[in-house]
Amino acid sequence: MRTSRSALALPLALVAVLGLSACSGDTAPEETTSASTSVETPETEETPAEDTESEEEAEPAASGDKPAWAATNEVVGTQLGTAEGDGFTVDIYQVSTAVATKTGQFADESGKPILNPGDPIVFVNYVLTNTGDADLPLTYSIVGVDARYADWPYMQGMDSIVDSALFEAAGVVDSPITPGSGEAPFILAPGQSVAYGENFKHQPGSPIEFEVTLTPADAAGDLNHDLRQEVALSATIA
């Protein structure tokens, strides 16, 4: 677990309640499109697809195929490294950079948003693969990844921009589960993979740590805390 930080980032909705008018704005996910959407994509490491009998299974994947409930398992970006646990791996990729189209979701103690329109952001992609010999039952959270720069001053995790157009342009999804896929547990069979991504402030050349938490599901689809695993990867954002 991380130690406490010197500053506190507050949700913008809470800041508004406290009367800090400078932080009103986007606190809930919404679909937006923007003519100013701009994505710069670094060289991508592609994994050749294996010969299969269906187009869906022919997508590039980290390992094996994609379960029916997964939105994607596509490998996008340049690999930063792999966080390896007992029976699973999470490959982490830096995908592309863009410009924030709106205010972020958090503010500092003075009421100033942490992310503002025009700020540079970077997209990363997480690919979870079952490397074990048995099915891996998962909850709705699938796998949690907490990314933080070494000099991140807040106790909360890093802020992000909720904009579906930016995610689409980057070629990543913000949710690993296809809508309407049913109830947990979601089974990840041996060799299967699932992917999702996120964005945060772009600080090129900055050391960053990715803390990965995987808590399998029990038969009812609830978190099985007795089997919780935490692993980490240290890298540098380009």
Write out the residue ranges for each language-model feature.
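C-terminal motif of bacterial Sec signal peptides marking the signal peptidase cleavage site
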Residues: 18-22
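The feature marks short-to-medium sequence segments in extracytoplasmic or secretory-pathway proteins
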Residues: 135-188, 235
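Surface-exposed edge beta-strand/loop patches
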Residues: 25, 181-238
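Bacterial Sec signal peptide processing site at the extreme N-terminus
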Residues: 26-32
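Bacterial N-terminal signal peptides that target proteins for export
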Residues: 1-11
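Short, solvent-exposed loop/turn segments enriched in Ser/Thr/Gly
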Residues: 120-124, 195
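Extracytoplasmic low-complexity, Pro/Thr/Ser/Ala/Gly-rich segments
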Residues: 33-117
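Asparagine-centered strand-capping/turn motif at beta-strand->loop junctions
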Residues: 127-132
